[in-house]
């Protein structure tokens, strides 16, 4: 089946089975961050991930997006378990199937805006349209020039570059870690609406956020508590999310 120009194995974008993640502390001590999480998310879904600090939100996103292998359990993205791929195929998979918006932007400071945005396209052998890049950045209220070094930009402007890079790649699945965190209220709304539109086009979007108002406009909210999904709320309201988060603090 095809949607939005890309081929889907079926309508399931990401399927997680009994995922747990532990980290080693010292020689003989481990800490459990994620505990027996199972989840299935379809194309066209916009999923927000919320929870108090330390609940495992960013770790879950890293496991879902092929960046951090689970200690146990399975992650399948578009029909593929990325943790079974060899390094070369995994790199290709990340370039072609998914896009990641990092909380710390993950840009190349020595390169200008245009080169940062189009680097994944060049690595994949795809054509580069600088006019399309400029148009996308303009839609996000980006003020700097394409020739500006990203190291000279504010945090908010760097975030817009990182988001444009993820969107311009036209991937099937987008993983976003606090994509609106460094932005003013106007830019925050623009970024969210851009992600919302991607889901409306049939893509799958995951978003870690602390913003209850934005999360209330997603299709599904996952509330994490102590490394587990304590609640899943379909079409969440702000009141439901607030109450769920207050409960998760106990």
Model-identified regions with their sequence ranges:
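Conserved ABC ATPase signature
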Residues: 149-153, 157-159
